[in-house]
Amino acid sequence: MLYQLSKATTRIRLKRQKAVPQHRWLWSLAFLAAFTLKDVRCADLAISIPNNPGLDDGASYRLDYSPPFGYPEPNTTIASREIGDEIQFSRALPGTKYNFWLYYTNFTHHDWLTWTVTITTAPDPPSNLSVQVRSGKNAIILWSPPTQGSYTAFKIKVLGLSEASSSYNRTFQVNDNTFQHSVKELTPGATYQVQAYTIYDGKESVAYTSRNFTTKPNTPGKFIVWFRNETTLLVLWQPPYPAGIYTHYKVSIEPPDANDSVLYVEKEGEPPGPAQAAFKGLVPGRAYNISVQTMSEDEISLPTTAQYRTVPLRPLNVTFDRDFITSNSFRVLWEAPKGISEFDKYQVSVATTRRQSTVPRSNEPVAFFDFRDIAEPGKTFNVIVKTVSGKVTSWPATGDVTLRPLPVRNLRSINDDKTNTMIITWEADPASTQDEYRIVYHELETFNGDTSTLTTDRTRFTLESLLPGRNYSLSVQAVSKKMESNETSIFVVTRPSSPIIEDLKSIRMGLNISWKSDVNSKQEQYEVLYSRNGTSDLRTQKTKESRLVIKNLQPGAGYELKVFAVSHDLRSEPHAYFQAVYPNPPRNMTIETVRSNSVLVHWSPPESGEFTEYSIRYRTDSEQQWVRLPSVRSTEADITDMTKGEKYTIQVNTVSFGVESPVPQEVNTTVPPNPVSNIIQLVDSRNITLEWPKPEGRVESYILKWWPSDNPGRVQTKNVSENKSADDLSTVRVLIGELMPGVQYKFDIQTTSYGILSGITSLYPRTMPLIQSDVVVANGEKEDERDTITLSYTPTPQSSSKFDIYRFSLGDAEIRDKEKLANDTDRKVTFTGLVPGRLYNITVWTVSGGVASLPIQRQDRLYPEPITQLHATNITDTEISLRWDLPKGEYNDFDIAYLTADNLLAQNMTTRNEITISDLRPHRNYTFTVVVRSGTESSVLRSSSPLSASFTTNEAVPGRVERFHPTDVQPSEINFEWSLPSSEANGVIRQFSIAYTNINNLTDAGMQDFESEEAFGVIKNLKPGETYVFKIQAKTAIGFGPEREYRQTMPILAPPRPATQVVPTEVYRSSSTIQIRFRKNYFSDQNGQVRMYTIIVAEDDAKNASGLEMPSWLDVQSYSVWLPYQAIDPYYPFENRSVEDFTIGTENCDNHKIGYCNGPLKSGTTYRVKVRAFTGADKFTDTAYSFPIQTDQDNTSLIVAITVPLTIILVLLVTLLFYKRRRNNCRKTTKDSRANDNMSLPDSVIEQNRPILIKNFAEHYRLMSADSDFRFSEEFEELKHVGRDQPCTFADLPCNRPKNRFTNILPYDHSRFKLQPVDDDEGSDYINANYVPGHNSPREFIVTQGPLHSTRDDFWRMCWESNSRAIVMLTRCFEKGREKCDQYWPNDTVPVFYGDIKVQILNDSHYADWVMTEFMLCRGSEQRILRHFHFTTWPDFGVPNPPQTLVRFVRAFRDRIGAEQRPIVVHCSAGVGRSGTFITLDRILQQINTSDYVDIFGIVYAMRKERVWMVQTEQQYICIHQCLLAVLEGKENIVGPAREMHDNEGYEGQQVQLDENGDVVATIEGHLSHHDLQQAEAEAIDDENAAILHDDQQPLTSSFTGHHTHMPPTTSMSSFGGGGGGHTNVDAPDRXHSVVNQSDNNNSVVIVLVDNKPSSMICKDSKGGNIDVLESQQQQQQQQQQQPNQGGHNITTISAINGYNTLQHRRKSQLITFSSSSCDIKNSLSHEYINGSNGSAANGPPSSGSGSGSGPGSNRASRANVRLSFAEEDVMILPQNHSQQSNHQDDEVFTRRRSLLEVEIGVEVGEDGELAPHEMEEDLEEEDEDEELYMHDEFETHIDTKSNNANDDSGGGSYEDSHALHSSLGGSNRNSLEKDDDDIEVDVISTDVSCYDQLLGSSCNTRNGDDDDIATLVGDGDYSTTKLSKASRLSGAGVGGLVVSGGGGGTAIGGGIAVNGGGVLGNGVGSEAGGGIIYANPFMDDEGIAESGM
């Protein structure tokens, strides 16, 4: 029984009468009724006296009341000064009427009745409340009256506590004394609360008594085992109907062989769908009884039961004896299964035939069987071996065997001399099958030589690698799947290679020849054939050498030669050549004529021999190279163009066919040299230098002669050698010195070579005169002469130089030069009319005969003109613009000068006639002077006279206040003084303004103005303890000037003392405790915020209690009367409330030695209490003491007598409840049990390092994982609070809060990554990231959250500023429809700027589980390469499954990123869970290479000290251990033994790998080519279930509509009915109606996800096959005509017709099935859901009956037991919102924990149990691991149903209600048990859930097929074969199936489905005389056992 307490308050206000006029008081009486578990019979009253004259010593009050039960006692008198503001009354009786009287007495009045009232106290609640549950809808409530006090009635409230019954709220009032009430119309399984109240005199009890109870839940529906293997049964059942309320199911199995024979399964979904449970660890082949019950709280329903059997173990190691393989027979061998398994025999068959054989079970370890008389040589057969236990077969063990092919025929060879190759041809035996041919050849003559082998698939082959000149043996074999036929052989010979002539030389009367041969060619000898030109004489010489000399030939004659190689009597191709013999030389050569540059030569012909022409050549003595002239036939030649001055040698020779005589004829001669020309004269006053180009030809020296023209007798001579004439070899230079200035001379020049002189060259040069005059400017310094220059000079003496005149020039083309005679006595020259300011270049010469002397040069500049006007065009506060007129003449610039405010001269230069003077002081007068300047300082500079003017600047804003500081600071106000220098006034000051801002609260700001003459001011109303920024500005008429800033923290003083009546009040008391109440508003924040409170307790309040250091409870224990003491350390209680109730005396201080302790009070003792408030550590103020409060007397012995038994009972109940919950939730995490964080250990007592030796790690893992990972849970719990006490100050700043993705994932201050601040912007250095240690560095990683869209620029800044070269991303951008991370990188290769950082994708590589991308980062001119590692299959809060996937990813990462490349940026969504797991695994994988131990706990501990919640969940913590265990055990890349899928043509040769628990971990290998893989969209939906064994280092990317999916090239995906195929993930947001085109040459299918929009009807696969999709009934009706199927792919349509659980009832996901086009029953059926109560088929009219066969002859009653089996990979479920988010691989697939598989009409796939945190703290708690991972391997269904077809005209009948699933949907309650041995058993081979859909009440249509889909039905008589027709939907009771004529008459199999009965296959089975069974399954054997893997 539980008491719920409440509080009620009644306040009555009374006004006192006018007995004492000077006292008018307003009194109020407040009644506070409080009930506790200890004492509920008391009521407390407070008489409030607001204006009590407490200083009147004579005044008092007397309180009287009846009945006399309460405290104070009746007629108690209390002095007025002792009361304070109120009188406390307590201990009133419950359910009682009280009368109160209050009397007042003072000096003038005695017992004056001031107030009276009658009050009824509230009654106690009822007692002994109980509930009797009668059924699921009825219950009786019973109770007893209260133990004390009166009552008149009772109120009963019934409240629904369950979610479904929360609206149930009924209230009943019971006025009689029956003390019970009946409640009806309750919900079965619901939980309710009963609340009982007592009513007395219209008042309810303030407390109530309550009790919870639960009604019985309804019994669950029927169930099936829809998946099983050798050790596992997966049970699927329907919920109760009506469902009612229940929390979970209890599922049990007998015999109890399972690991857990009793399972508890939680209910999922609302309304609840079918549920499931898995029993593992069963014995293969054994029968088991299974029961299912519903549970709600402690209530349990009646059971539903059935019996099923497990699958036996399969055979092992199917092999073939190669010695027994012939062209028509073979032997197969196999081993018995290992382990315990029950089976009777073996079944052996060949997949392509219908022949099956059985082999009895024996004790031999190896069994065998011989297949004979197979007339198909070379063909490959798939042999299937199974164990059979009863009617159940095991999974198949298969092997491929190929028969030996027949030998080839007609083998021939042909040599091709043109290409030097050999072609061989042959014929294949038409009776044999082969896929290639093997060619083997070797050389016969070579011992131990190499044998070459080639293969081809054609019957013709060209051999190009045979060596020339060899004899070979060659054989050909036919090969089929590496099985060879017998050999067929021949011999072949090759021709030798042609020799190549290396050297052929002419000799006297003969030829010398040599050659070389191919090193690979063999030859026996060589033959040389030669003949003379023009004759038929052919001669032959043979030799074994590679050279030959031929003699006695005709001189000058030509010969043709051929060389052959000979081998095995075969000649090679010849090598031919033509060569002539040396001719005889000419005779009698002479020189006939020598001219200036030519020579005529003559000679005589030779005496004998042949020749064709004469060759002529010549050269000089200094040259080696001959110059050859054209050949001639005459006996003379004219040689021209010879070089002058050279000596030549000339040769003449005879020539025959290009071969010259070895002895030529020669002669020598010399040519005269050339004279000089083009002489250049270089003349000065004393020298003449002559320079001419070197003449053509040879010159040895030059001869020069010269003399004065007027004196020929003075001749001088000079001889100049050619080698000394000049440095330049192309010219000749000669200097003639010591000549007279101004004189003319004559020169003669000749050349000489080999003693021969050339002609004479003459010339007449003159020397330059001298000038020795001194020239000056006479007026150069006169400023007023601005247009005239006068020159003055001295004469040059005639004795030193001959000249005629003087010449003067100013260098101006407009001014003519002036000349004066040499003997002129006037020595001045004047130039007038010049330009002012211009610079003139003055030049003076002497001239003799037109030759001028060197010049004398001077410079002079005239003064410029000054300006005449100066005025200002614009004036501002700091600038004046000036303008003036332009002067005449030339000038360079203007010089503007003025005095600054500091009296410094400032000068400005400008070339324009205007200027703007800046940086002036406002409100100042300035004088400006302008001077015109011509020239520069580096040349001649002239300045004009100046012109001045004065101007004044405008006003401006004032300057910065110079001095600004406080003179007095108080908690809430501050006094300032300031000053502004006059130089900074910048005008007339109008005012000063002070603005202030609280830096911690920007809204706390203001501004105050002061007069211009004020220099002091005060700012008020500030907040104590806050820091303010004060800014002062001066103001002129223009505006405010710049700010001067001062920062001040306001002081904090003790709080103001509150009023005397403000004291703590009593709330409750006991014998050792007092509970007081005080409020936040007791103290004002005027002197600073009150930060802490403490309690002062005084028994003797007269003692001093105002000191800072107060005695503690321990200090006063030695006093009989306790001194005032402090009860607790200061604390702050007003975080979320304004009232605090504090209990004094609650602690046990026996072990408390130091500090304050809230020890117990003394019983029956009066205390006073006051509250102390602190604004600082030493700043405090106390309230006045409270009214006296007396503790109760001690009743401890009574309490102990009651409490101890109750405590023992409570402990037992808690223990029992804990044991029960742990049993029910054996795999639950301890999340709920950890709700109280106070149970966690502090960091100081946690052992931070826990190293484990690597050699002991496997045993350590076994111990930790025992008992449902209990020790892992304990160890992980110790990490819960590690590091959580560290500050996150910066992350919580207002400017940084929007940058955090989650409000409780904040970076610690000490380890956060700090960005470079931007422009002093607050928070610009913040990003949610921390440094985390790695194996190689304490700052190896930067862990951050997934970037938000608003923080991705900061993210790239962090990558750049940290110089990181790698990013590891462990999340997808969207998961379950929620954003986990912004896509912070470009979509394509186009560069994108993120802030000032440009990011461009260089390349990317796609793998099955991750993507690696290279980015180019650019910032300014700097570039970097960064790698991005994106793991794409990690579920949020989950772990990759298998864990080896994560190990391979870490390995791939570390292979590319070295230890020195750090830091590494790592992020997931929050940056804690997955990121921590990755880093831990990276560290331990490196640690095990260098150490003999690992410390996973220590690594996680260290990371949590740097960033919050690293490795967030226990599941992730365990995953790290699992990864390491896999690495240490060598299972990093090994994922378990191979298993095989269903034996079916669509599964030929396919295998799947399972782990030791039977979980799927690898792919199904099938007939799938690499080309098929490239076209498949093979990305797995969930990495925990994806059956893909991939090669991490071989990426393959296939594209679909612009979106990439990934598939490893070495992977064969599961084939759903064909040889290939695979999963496909619709990968784009807008692909809700898209179809992934998936090609397969073995009839694989395409996977489609479509919603209910009309656009998704029928789609085409890549071969044109139809793809039917999930669609509504309306769409199904609109799509009766399907498009043509060109590729043979047949895929199912699923539609809904408002059935029990149709698409309208689904809420989380949709179903997609994979199907096959042939070879199983399901391929002739489609899936259409029907109404369970509708008697018509889906496509037939309602009148057609309920599920009949469509053919005649099926009248006889029959029973069919149907099994369905399908593999995990055959069914894939995607969420309905999958079209909006791509790549949600972790959302759904079967093996998630809470939801395994959802079938459209009864099984719903729930969420995978993972939390998806987004903006809420509770989402980030540990993952709830209630989910049970039931299975990872294949799914199958075994349903035994029995059917009795009633006789009717339609050939079919109703289906009996014994069908298990039908019963659960509304049929009878009869269980579906194992069939009888005599029953006909039909095994349906299915690879999707379509067959299961049929069992749930669906009807079936004939699957569309092509002409190749043939099903053969066999009877005892004749049989016929009917092809499945395209679109053969038949109206009628069922659907048109296969209609055949049976053996002997009238057996047929109808395609109908029993609709109302929920039938599966309308097998009309009939017989006639001799008629037998018709097998509906093309794979069924003679015993009715289908090859289904069951």
Curated annotation (Swiss-Prot):
Major subcellular site: membrane
GO CC terms of this entry: apical part of cell; axon; membrane
UniProt keywords, alphabetically: Developmental protein, Differentiation, Glycoprotein, Hydrolase, Membrane, Neurogenesis, Protein phosphatase, Repeat, Signal, Transmembrane, Transmembrane helix
Membrane topology designation: Single-pass type I membrane protein
Biased composition (Polar residues): 1684-1693
Gene3D superfamilies given in the database record: Immunoglobulins, Protein tyrosine phosphatase superfamily
Location within or outside the cell: Membrane
One example GO MF annotation: protein tyrosine phosphatase activity
Signal sequence, start to end: 1-42
Entry's EC annotation: 3.1.3.48
Start-end of Low complexity biased regions: 1673-1683, 1732-1745
Note: This protein is translated by readthrough of a stop codon. Readthrough of the terminator codon TAG occurs between the codons for Arg-1631 and His-1633. There is currently no sequence that provides the identity of residue 1632.
Protein name, as recorded: Tyrosine-protein phosphatase 10D
Organism of provenance: Drosophila melanogaster
